[in-house]
Amino acid sequence: MNVAGIYIDSLSVHSIWGVAGGNRLVNPHENYKSRDMILSLDDKVSPLQGHSFSRQGSHKVCSNFLPWICSNKTWGLGKSETIADHALEFYLVDLFAQIPHEAKVAFSLPLYLTPKQTRRIEQIASKIGMQVQGSLTSASALALGAIRKSQTSSNCLAVELDGFGLSLSHVQVAEGVPHLLAGKVFPEFGLHRWVLKLADFIAEKAILHCRKDPRVKPDTDQALFLQAQKLMANIGTKVSFKVVLEEEFWSQEFVITQTDLKKCFSGLFSALKLQLNDFIQHKITTRDDIHLALAHNLGGVPGLTSLLVQDNSGASYHTHSPEDLFHQSFICSNAMTMAGQWWLDSVGASSVVQYRNPIGASKV
C-alpha cells in the first residue's frame, strides 16, 4: 500500500510518498515534489516560482493565502478573481498528479490554522480524489523527528517560520504519539517582515551614499526586494554580499556585511527575545532535558538559531532540513494508515482534533 505525506506552509507545498511499512524511502528525490505557492492572475491563473513576485499586489498575484482558507478574501479582479480555497486546490491537483492515486494521504499543517480550516483543507483534498487519513501540526512532525534523532528527551520546543509568522510550540511525545501542550504564533516575526526590514536597510544605505531612494520606482523597488530575499536565502554561506541597484543613468553597488545584518535586525531580535522568554517562562512547565526542533528556514534569518539555543542553554537541538520534515509527514501518513480507525474520533473527524489546541493567531 502506498502512503503520502503533504506538508504545507504559507509559502510552499511539498509531498513525499512511499510504501506503507517502510521506515525509509528508497528513492526520496524521485518521490519528493515541492512548489512555491504563488499564482499569477494576469491573463490566466498560472504558477510562479520565487516569492519576490508577491510585491506585485493582490490584484496581480495570489500569495501567502493559506491563513485565509475558509474565508471570503479575494485576490485578482474580474475573471481572474480567486479565493484561498481555489488557490490551494490548484496546487493540490498538481501534487496529486505526481503521487499514486491510491495512496493514503496525511497532512502536516501550520499551528495557526484552526480545526475548521484543517477540515476544509482535507475536504478540498478529498474532493479532488485524495484518500485523506488525517492531519498533524507540522510542530508535531518536527517533534517526532527531533525525538527520533536525539533519543534523549520527550519534550520538544518546535520553532517554525513562514510568510505568516513565527510559531513556538511545546510538544510532548509519549509512546510515539505527539501531544501539543502549548503554542503561540507571532505574525510580527513572519519571514516577509525580515526581508522587508533588510530591503529598507539597503534602501537607507542608498540614500546615505547617493541621496537616491530605490523604493520610489516600482522596478527598482522590485529588484531591491528580490536581492534582499536572495541575500536572506544565502545568509549563512558568505561573510559579505554585493547588492546592485540599477536604473536608467544610475547604478549603485553596496557590500552588506554580517555586521550590517546584525545592526539591521537588532530591533526585531530584541522584540523576539522578549516574546521567546515569556513563552518559555509561562508555557513550558519544565525545562529539564528539553529538545529544540528548528524548521529548516530559520537558517535564513541570521543569528536566529543562535538566539534560540542561547535562550535554552543546556538543551540539545536539531535543525531539520526540508527532507527531514517531509519525511516526518511520510511517517505520520504511514502511522495513520497502519493504525486505521484508532486515529479517528467517533464522527470520523481527522486526528488533528486530538492534538491541536484552538490557538490560531488573529488574521487582521
Spans of model-derived segments:
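Conserved phosphate-binding loops in N-terminal lobes of ATP-dependent enzymes
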Residues: 12-14, 22-108, 235-239, 272, ...
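Phosphate-binding glycine-rich/basic clefts of nucleotide- and phosphate-handling proteins
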Residues: 173-258
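Active-site neighborhood for divalent-cation/phosphate handling
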Residues: 84-146
